[in-house]
């Protein structure tokens, strides 16, 4: 299929059968129209209304019930890595050395309970990420690139589950190396507060993941606010 020549709008794009495709005679679908939206609730509503035939996302609060009763709901593997990116030029790192900023980012990362996010938010059997390279990538020699992850030197994504207190204490140690102080209760001192903003679009899954991270960081007194915006604003903010 190829573009039908019309301008792609903010909410849809249309493709038509390409007569120059080498096997065009076997193409039976003459036109494809795609709904463009970052709002999974709107996408799911359009599917239920019969406005679209296929969707690849649903609101997270619908997943559990769909698994049990809807034969049209399928979970399939896909290569990908969900990640949170830092703006290293933000005020958060303004007075820090590169080494101190790295300590801060590591502390934030190890405090995130990835297993909780998978079980309670994503709910589709994802694996916790411990590098940018996703699971399932070939190694070029007929094998899988990532196997015994921790033994290969990768970050242990289950550390926060297997040794919560030890992992939290490591996060405190990293933040102390970056100049932050803690009280006797293990919480950040009011002398050296940490506040940061988490930017996401309005999809329910992204917001809920942000809320889970917000709760994890609050465990030692880090204040993270969640800023929701539509997709176009989100892209501009990230530039």
Predicted segments — roles?
Residues 7-11, 161-168, 178-239:
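Ligand/substrate-recognition segments at binding pockets and active sites
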Residues 15-65, 214, 223-225, 230:
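Ligand-site clamp/hinge motif
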Residues 16-22, 79-104, 111, 120:
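A bilobed periplasmic-binding-protein/Venus flytrap-type ligand-binding module shared by bacterial periplasmic
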Residues 20, 48, 52, 67-68, ...:
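Sec-exported extracytoplasmic/periplasmic mature domains
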Residues 33, 51, 91-98, 104-107, ...:
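Second-shell loop/turn segments in exported
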Residues 43-44, 104-105, 234-238:
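Short, hydrophobic alpha-helical packing/hinge segments within bilobed ligand-binding/sensory domains
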Residues 63-77:
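Ligand-binding "clamshell"
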Residues 127-178, 201-207:
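Structural transition elements
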């Amino acid at each position: 299929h190829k573009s039908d020549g019309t301008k792609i709008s903010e909410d849809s794009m249309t493709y038509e059968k390409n007569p120059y495709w080498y096997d065009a005679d076997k193409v039976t679908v003459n036109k494809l129209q795609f709904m463009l939206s970052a709002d999974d609730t709107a996408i799911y509503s359009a599917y239920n209304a019969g406005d679209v035939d296929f969707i690849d996302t649903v609101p997270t609060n619908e997943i559990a019930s769909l698994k049990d009763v809807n034969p049209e709901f399928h979970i399939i593997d896909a290569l990908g890595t969900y990640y949170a990116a830092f703006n290293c030029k933000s005020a958060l790192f303004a007075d820090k050395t590169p080494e101190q900023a790295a300590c801060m980012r590591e502390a934030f990362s190890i405090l995130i309970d990835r297993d909780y996010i998978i079980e309670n938010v994503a709910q589709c059997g994802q694996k916790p990420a411990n590098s940018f390279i996703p699971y399932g990538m070939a190694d070029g020699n007929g094998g899988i690139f990532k196997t015994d992850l921790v033994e290969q030197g990768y970050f242990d994504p289950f550390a926060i589950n297997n040794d919560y207190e030890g992992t939290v204490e490591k996060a405190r140690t990293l933040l102390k190396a970056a100049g932050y102080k803690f009280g006797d209760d293990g919480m950040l001192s009011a002398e050296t507060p940490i506040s940061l903003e988490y930017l996401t679009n309005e999809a329910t899954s992204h917001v809920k993941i942000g809320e889970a991270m917000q709760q994890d960081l609050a465990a030692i007194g880090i204040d993270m606010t969640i800023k929701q915006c539509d997709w176009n604003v989100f892209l501009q903010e990230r530039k």
